[in-house]
Amino acid sequence: MEQRKCSFCGELLEPGTGLLFAKRDGSTYYFCSSKCKGNFDLGRLPRRTVWTEQGRIYLKKA
């Protein structure tokens, strides 16, 4: 089975876990937790959030 990546934090998702969100235009988003989905819904940027993969790179916390 193929692994997915969380659309917000970048964490790998095991098959059968996480949340799937599909928009009407056909785009799909995968989330590892409700925390990631909530931040995505609020319009927060992953690169400005310290605990995300992009945030660690952008804020030099790697």
Swiss-Prot record:
GO terms for cellular component: ribonucleoprotein complex; ribosome. The keyword DNA-binding does not apply. One of its GO terms (molecular function) is zinc ion binding. Binds 1 zinc ion per subunit. A zinc finger (C4-type) spans 6-36. Zn(2+) binds at C6, C9, C32, C36. Its cofactor is Zn(2+). The keyword Ribonucleoprotein applies. GO terms for biological process: translation. It comes from the Archaea. Keywords: Metal-binding, Ribonucleoprotein, Ribosomal protein, RNA-binding, rRNA-binding, Zinc, Zinc-finger. CDD domains: Ribosomal_L24e_L24 (cd00472). PROSITE patterns: RIBOSOMAL_L24E (PS01073). Binds to the 23S rRNA. Part of the 50S ribosomal subunit. Forms a cluster with proteins L3 and L14. HAMAP family: Ribosomal_eL24. Belongs to the eukaryotic ribosomal protein eL24 family. This is Large ribosomal subunit protein eL24. It comes from Methanococcoides burtonii (strain DSM 6242 / NBRC 107633 / OCM 468 / ACE-M).
